Amino acid sequence: MSNKKVVEAYIDGFNKSDHAEILACLTDNVIWEMPGLFYLEGKEEFDKEIENDAFVGSPIVTIIRLVEEGDIVVAEGHVKSKMKNGGLLDAMFCDLFHFENGKIKQLTGYLMHNKQQ
């Protein structure tokens, strides 16, 4: 499976709230960073963050563009998700995936809230 296909499976896991599908795409020592927001290491910490109780139901994640070069995939996309406080997350993202042996070893994500509503 190409690295792009792994990212597509990872995103599909979020759209279905399928933790097993998401975690299967990751190395055991995965690093997830959103600069200025958080830095996590390991599948257990990753799983806790995707179980974030501020949100309700599955998000809707749409990929706009995937670019692959060597062991790196860049994903540009849009995410919407209902929040428990009644709000809506509506944001654009750019995620940088580093791969090792066909799995995501590091994810650096940048998120910008959509103000054009």
What is each model feature region?
Residues S2, N15, E33, D47-Q117:
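A beta-strand edge to alpha-helix "cap/lid" segment located at domain peripheries
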